[in-house]
């Protein structure tokens, strides 16, 4: 099939590679404009642009995909299908309805659940047993198009946002290729989404990672995993940010008198871990990163920093 691919971040790269490896004709790649980064403000390519350039594929970078001039330029590529994976802009009906097979989107959730941005992280934060990937035929709504194919993935006990991202990226790449095969063969019957079952997730911001120790240890442990590696869960100690990268949940700590502790209080300090009281249960902290320092296991942190029981975190 003659394909135009629209995508921007790392998550989309695997799908572009899979389309190329499957022998489809990628006529053009559409991605977000280059962004200035660092002190030098030098322009940096998106991961998808890097991949396209490596394969000698034409790259288009519209500021606004809705601009009529871009729509008309896109039309000249005569695509059979447009594949959209985390492109980063809403598409007008003039693009959605342009190709013979429409615009096919790869979404990292089991639609209609977890429509919107950041479905991967939220699946971990919410403690979902399963996540997955859905391919759908796009319409003008937010992840509301007809479902084409679905693949479920069971989350591991210590799944992080990063590990699930990698797994679903691989699943999505192969599922999209299967979807293109099915569309071409006429063996796929689109299924309308049940809007009554839909849920939407919010876009994540750095501030969301601030830990509220009044919550249960189980909730906070999932937050830590879901926001690893970005934007990360954090608290404060002596006015410095302390990121917490890995922790376990403990329901009871034998040496702690429950009625004497407050949420956010350090209640035990061992050789390799320390424990924080929460609204319900305790967090046993295994890996941290103090502001201005590298990530390290808690043992290394404790050897370089004097931490005592009774210290209140979050201040």
Task: Please report, for each region that a protein language model flagged, where it lies by residue.
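N-terminal Rossmann-like dinucleotide-binding module
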Residues: 1-40
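Internal alpha/beta domain cores that form substrate/cofactor-binding pockets in large enzymes
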Residues: 2-4, 27-28, 58-77, 90-108
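A residue-level signal for conserved active-site and pocket-lining positions in enzyme catalytic cores
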Residues: 7, 29, 52, 82, ...
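Amphipathic, non-transmembrane alpha-helical secondary structure
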Residues: 13, 17-21, 71-75, 93, ...
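Donor/substrate-binding cores of folate-linked one-carbon enzymes
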Residues: 22, 32, 81-200, 207
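N-terminal glycine-/serine-/threonine-rich beta1-alpha1-beta2 phosphate-ribose binding loop
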Residues: 32, 36-78
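Acyl-group handling in specialized metabolite and lipid biosynthesis
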Residues: 202-215
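An anion-binding loop in the catalytic cleft
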Residues: 213-315
């Amino acid at each position: 099939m003659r394909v135009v691919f629209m995508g921007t971040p790392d998550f989309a790269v695997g799908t572009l590679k899979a389309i190329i490896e499957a022998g489809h004709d990628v006529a053009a790649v559409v991605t977000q404009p280059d962004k200035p980064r660092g002190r030098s403000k030098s322009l940096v390519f998106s991961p998808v642009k890097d991949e396209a350039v490596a394969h000698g594929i034409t790259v288009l970078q519209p500021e606004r995909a809705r601009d009529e001039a871009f729509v008309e330029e896109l039309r000249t590529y005569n695509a059979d299908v447009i594949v959209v994976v985390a492109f980063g802009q809403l598409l007008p009906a003039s693009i959605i309805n342009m190709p013979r097979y429409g615009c096919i989107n790869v979404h990292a959730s089991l639609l209609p659940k977890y429509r919107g941005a950041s479905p991967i992280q939220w699946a971990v934060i919410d403690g979902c047993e399963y996540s997955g990937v859905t391919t759908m035929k796009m319409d003008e709504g937010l992840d509301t198009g007809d479902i084409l194919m679905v693949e479920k993935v069971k989350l591991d006990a210590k799944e992080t946002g990063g590990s699930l991202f990698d797994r679903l990226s691989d699943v999505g790449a192969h599922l999209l290729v299967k979807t293109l095969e099915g569309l071409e063969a006429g063996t796929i019957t689109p299924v309308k989404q049940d809007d009554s079952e839909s849920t939407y997730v919010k876009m994540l911001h750095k501030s969301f990672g601030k830990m509220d120790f009044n919550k249960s240890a189980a909730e906070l442990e999932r937050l830590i995993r879901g926001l690893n590696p970005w934007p990360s869960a954090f608290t404060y100690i002596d006015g410095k940010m302390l990121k917490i990268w890995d922790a376990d949940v403990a329901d009871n700590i034998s040496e702690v008198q429950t009625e004497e502790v407050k949420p956010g209080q350090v209640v035990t300090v061992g050789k390799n871990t320390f424990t924080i009281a929460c609204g319900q249960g305790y967090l046993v902290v295994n890996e941290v990163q103090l502001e201005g320092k590298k990530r390290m296991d808690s043992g290394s942190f404790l050897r370089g920093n004097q931490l005592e029981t009774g210290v209140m975190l979050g201040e």
